[in-house]
Amino acid sequence: MSEDDQDRILDQSLKVIQAQSYHIHTTIEKNNLRQCLKETFTMLNELRTNKLTPKNYYHLYTSVFDEMQHISNFFKEEIKRGRRIRDLYDSVQQSMYIIPRMYLLITSGSIYIENYPKSCREVIFDLLAVVKGVQNPIRGLFTRYYLLKSIKDKLPDKNNIYDNEGGNFDDTLKFIIQNLDEMNRLWIRLSMGVIGEEKKLREKDRNELKILIGENITRLASLEGLSNEIYQREVLPKILNIIIESKDQLSQQYLMECIIHAFPDEFNISCLDSILNCTKKLVSSVDIKNLFIGLLEKLSKFVKNSDAAKEQILNNSNTIFSILKESFDNLIKENCKEGNNMDIVKVIESQCSFMKFIIISCVSDNKLELVNYVLNLSDEVIKSYGEKIDTSVIKALNRLLSTPLESELSLFDLNQFPKLMNNLDFNSKNNLSLRIIESFVNGKSNEKLDSVDKIKKLLNFIKPLLEDLPDSTQDDFQFEYDQYNVAKLIFVINTNNPEILYNIYTEFKNVFINGGAKRKKITLPSLINAIINLCYSISIAYDEKNNNYPQEKKNEFFNDRINSIDISKINSNDNFYDTMIKFYKLINDIIQSLNQEQPIISFKLYLQAALQVNSINSNKEKFEEACVSFINSAFGIYADNKYEGDYKYSLLNLLSGYLLYFNNLSKENIENFIKNIQSSAHSLVKRSDQCNSMIFVSQLYFSLLKDYKSVIECLEKAKKFADLSMTNPQNLNLFVIILNKMIYYIENSDEMFIQSKFINDINEVIQSHIETLHNENKFIGFLPEIENYYTRTVDMIKIRREIGKKGIYSEITNIDIK
């Protein structure tokens, strides 16, 4: 029958119901019971049709059901007016057709129970017997559904008025389970005896009716008198028996789902072995995978929040997990059969649910064994799958592999994990690798990274982040984000043994240097900084052990430093030296591997390493060679690379700034370094840069060597470079800087090596240039700032002269600004 025909028939029936509804209401208003029954019979006759699909019949039924509520209320009013309930019960049986008679019998029977609770048992089983007369599957299902809905609140239950007087709780269970059984049989009959396309249509019809059958289980689950014990002893075995005996795929699938989702989780936990055993007896076409997913996901959530549930699992763990393993073995075996159309996504999702359940509920020692069992099964499934792995499979596999990362299990004990990861696409591998890193960085993992073996395994797990893969496609931002996360691993190593740390850092180096230039730029500097930081900790701890660490340097980080490392095996200066030199060689090797692609970063890292070596106080003479080697390497990078002028000037000043802190070098080495810087300053492009660098060199001579003659020579050269730079008037500030530097030396030296003539000459040059700029109307925007700087300098000289400090100030002339 076409859809248009269905709509036409349904519309006609609804119009009849609407018309009869009007007549029924009219008779109710007149309190005419006989006529009301007559009109109701006519309305209910519409439910006798066999021409509507289940969906349309349900529409028809709901319209009738709404009207039956008005009729039920009218019957109740009639009883209040004195009509005998028994007469009413007999009157409704006058219809010659069974459907109208059944609906009115059920309605009056419900009222009968309500008024005479003691009759409950007799009436409900009487009604249950008479509805057997409706053998048409669709009409029979809806009649029984109406029966269940009409008396659902009138069944004997804990603490209600029908319990004891009108029966007991066992009667209620018997009634609902028997109704479930009969409805299930009718439901199955809907598709019996047909094949092909007709079978498919009938199965579709049946699927639309399943909620009617499920109402029985919903009602059972809502009974207050239903205890765990009764569920185990009476309810579940009978329902499972109904399911098994039905031998119907749709029935078994749906009713098992109802059991899983309707009854309390604590009940199903107690009966888990029975439920799992039942799955082995279902017909082969039942989707066991979906049942496992629903059951295990639901129970996992429950167990997670219930200690009592965990205890239940613990008490029966061997049985439960043995049955689960057997069930999954059968599931995989069945799905991997040649010729079977494997739903690999559902298979993997069911395994994911199983793994979650294991992780949450298994408190025994075999948790790891079970998780590895699931991973091995997944590997078998992937191998057996003959088709290309698509996005949906990858997503399912990704969820499976992400599950153990949320547990306390050691990632390193999951043998199949890296192998399964290889089946993912690039982005999924990347994301999973990041989750692995986060589990360690954020402290989710209980595993300590305290051995080379673990580091090797970890780096193998996150291999997608460490090398370029054929299908890799990433924007620069995501790439850098990933690599910074990789670098974080270096700082969560959990051992204080220098020897183990050396081996771990060496392993990081061996992997990182093969990652390509873009990765090395991020990962190697982090590794070097970690090693330098470790060297500080070792040297500070050893200095303190030998009472060589300066008291004034013991800041808030001091205790953290000495407590972060175990130097118990470093018991001599030679042993200490050998340990440190080994780390310095490692630092040098790593920087050399970075130097070609990132010379600037390498330059800075060499200086940081040299600064650490210089900080050593114990046996410091032996370490000078290592310090000098690092500084020379930095000089080498500066000399070998041709940078823009401004950048080269910045690097030279950085080098000069670092040199100020190298207080443990010999005088000879310091002189050589200063001369190299001085020579480099002459080769700078800009005169202003040459001037500033020469001023800085004067500071090196002053602070490190107290070589005042060289200080004067540098200042004179700086003045010469400043003179040559005055083609740009803005460089006038260089003279003010030189003047300030000379005053600094006067203030910080007991020896009067600065001559007043030099100061007066500089002072005169400054004033002359300022006057010239004003006379030529070159009052450029920068000039007020320079004048302000110069004025503050002159004011300071005046103050010093007034208080009689340092006789040289009295020899400074011409300091009044014109």
Which residues make up each language-model segment?
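Long amphipathic alpha-helical scaffold regions
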Residues: M1-S428, S433-I436, F635-Y638, E644-L665, ...
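Extended, charge-rich low-complexity regions and/or helical-solenoid scaffolds
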Residues: S445-I770
